[in-house]
Amino acid sequence: MILSPIEQSIKRKIEAVGKPLKDWDIQIYRGVLTGCNEAFIIDAAKRAEILSNCQSEDERKRTEAIIRPILRGRDIRRYDYVDSGKYLINTHNGVKEKGIPPIDITDYPAIKGHLDSFGDAVMLRSDQGDTPYNLRNCAYLEEFEKPKIMYPNMTKYMPFYFDIQGFYQNDKSFLITGRHLSYLAAFLNSSLFKFCFTNSFPELQGGTRELRKIFFDKIPVLPVDDNTDELFEELLRSIQDFYSNEKALEIDRHIFDLYQLTPEEVALIGAVNL
């Protein structure tokens, strides 16, 4: 692709001050792979049914604790998400290195009954843990509970959502944990990122982009200090509480200022359709 002189100027500015994301203090992970989504990802009605089948209050509390709200890649929006009312039955396989034991299905009879109803689809699936009732090993299990940036693995719109609610995610999405996530989420949702880096991700059929980690690692992003991240934390909280174009433009202006873009450069970037 041949860039105009002003486009080349913007690209040089980004690359001159940017640090590749692979060198940031962040981690990028894939969402949960169950091997049988129809059994392990349930709606609110099925969740209520499973809980009603518990034989004691203790079982109900244990069961409720491992049925976690989950977002799919398609549910993620720019600064927002669609609540599809889905839940993950998180019968995880533990993390031996951290002393987290696997879920013992005998402690969860109501969940066992639900999973048993799927027969070989659960029992014989390839992605399983120590038992067919357990999900496959996931060394980053605790990362889902942390503040994180969520985004789909394939998308036309490249949306990012900063989650502090502890959503789990399916395997059609990725999560980023680490430092300065408020700023990073704002940058990834900005006009500048879309303008400069959309073409850094392979285009698939229908204009969809593939947002794999191997491509993210190469993206240069200006590092910031804690004070700057706190500024974007406030901006992010505001726009995620109630979205408006004015708030999105305000975030863009702060990003443009950080990169010291000229009015001419800003005008060109402002034409990007978000």
Region spans (language model):
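Polybasic, glycine- and aromatic-enriched phosphate-binding surface used to engage nucleic acids
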Residues: M1-N227
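Non-catalytic DNA-recognition/assembly elements of restriction-modification systems
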Residues: V17, L21, D25, A110-H114, ...
